[in-house]
Amino acid sequence: MNPNQKIITIGSVSLGLVVLNILLHIVSITITVLVLPGNGNNPSCNETVIREYNETVRIERVTQWHNTNVIEYLERPESDHFMNNTESLCDAKGFAPFSKDNGIRIGSRGHVFVIREPFVSCSPTECRTFFLTQGSLLNDKHSNGTVKDRSPYRTLMSVQIGQSPNVYQARFEAVAWSATACHDGKKWMTIGVTGPDAKAVAVVHYGGIPTDVINSWAGDILRTQESSCTCIQGECYWVMTDGPANRQAQYRAFKAKQGKIIGQTEISFNGGHIEECSCYPNEGKVECVCRDNWTGTNRPVLVISPDLSYRVGYLCAGLPSDTPRGEDSQFTGSCTSPMGNQGYGVKGFGFRQGNDVWMGRTISRTSRSGFEILKVRNGWVQNSKEQIKRQVVVDNLNWSGYSGSFTLPVELTKRNCLVPCFWVEMIRGKPEEKTIWTSSSSIVMCGVDHEIADWSWHDGAILPFDIDKM
């Protein structure tokens, strides 16, 4: 075969392959367009599909064209109504685990914030964990000295419940070293307290935008709940303290609508001390169980009505629930006065169940270790010592810390009552352990119709970290 014949042969073969390739593409397109849509189980090629995720991540509009998806991210629409939250609390026979973030364990090798004061609050579509960061990460040099409560680096951030407080999923909420947050059914309201001790300011955010402020009125570390505020029929309530931590201070209850303060009242409580209230809605009122950091080992109780009238006293039960505290057998209880002579304290909570009360407390009487929740018959109204239920959440070999309350709204549960829930903070690092940092993780429990076995859902991180050995 001469060279010209070889060229002609190669060219003919190449041309044949090109024609065959074109025919194969035509067949493929014909099958895709004509045959596949004929199957009743598949949507048409150019159908637009709206996918709404039950979380605050995104809503997608997916336009399907042949084998290509075009995804457009849409802004989540506002709910068109406020949550009611006037229902009574559901009766709880026990508390089942809802979530656990394991933030410190993950943070030994992950990008997790150094935090304290975590708490949970829920909207009609989700629950979120809020926390106060220290503007630093675990196992990093900036974590040094984070045992300090107040600094210009502290911020309120949040993640979806169960997620660790990591840099990739956290959402900024407010600049704050003290905070509260709640959802009215339409938008989140957050309140962050920041600034110098003598002139601190609380900034109210609604839907992520600053909408109002509260300036310190007593000039002594204005502070708030470190747990969920409470919204009832579109109006949101919270409690603030300004004044000494170890003697008489000043206390106020506030009410806001869509981020604007519409009312406040001074709470008269001579001889009593109120800090870090854990509040929840119940039968149209706000019920709070707080911390007495002055003398009482029983907890203050504050019940706020929609018109901001209130009743204030102490949890009646004949068992103390603050830490440090004395022996149960030596405690008598009082509905009106602080009992015991133990200064300091720890944030805690309680739930009214008719005349009974569920009350959480550390297992240790002297330190923030272990955690249990007790049900005391008639403990909301009498100095009763009759303990009818007890559940251990963290054993006494492991550290606990703050604890607080929130409820699951009926929009989430589809029940006709509000599910009582609580969280327990588990503090690690300074001052109890040999580290340069202080941080915490949390376990969250919700009321159920069954008794739940004792167990220890403790933090579990192995300390010290690498940064502590340098």
From Swiss-Prot:
Top-rank taxon: Viruses
Disulphide bridges: C90-C417, C122-C127, C182-C229, C231-C236, C277-C290, C279-C288, C316-C335, C421-C446
Cofactors that this protein relies on: Ca(2+)
Binding site for substrate: R116, R150, E275, E276, R291, R368
Cellular compartments annotated: Virion membrane; Host apical cell membrane
InterPro entries, alphabetized: Glyco_hydro_34, Sialidase_sf
Biological process, per Gene Ontology: carbohydrate metabolic process; viral budding from plasma membrane
Keywords: Calcium, Disulfide bond, Glycoprotein, Glycosidase, Host cell membrane, Host membrane, Hydrolase, Membrane, Metal-binding, Signal-anchor, Transmembrane, Transmembrane helix, Virion
Substrates-to-products reaction catalysed: Hydrolysis of alpha-(2->3)-, alpha-(2->6)-, alpha-(2->8)- glycosidic linkages of terminal sialic acid residues in oligosaccharides, glycoproteins, glycolipids, colominic acid and synthetic substrates
Amino-acid positions noted as binding Ca(2+) in the UniProt annotation, renumbered to this chain: D292, G296, D322
Domain characteristics, as noted in the entry: Intact N-terminus is essential for virion morphogenesis. Possesses two apical sorting signals, one in the ectodomain, which is likely to be a glycan, and the other in the transmembrane domain. The transmembrane domain also plays a role in lipid raft association.
Miscellaneous field: The influenza A genome consist of 8 RNA segments. Genetic variation of hemagglutinin and/or neuraminidase genes results in the emergence of new influenza strains. The mechanism of variation can be the result of point mutations or the result of genetic reassortment between segments of two different strains.
Name the record gives this protein: Neuraminidase
Source organism: Influenza A virus (strain A/Herring gull/DE/677/1988 H2N8)
Encoding gene (name): NA
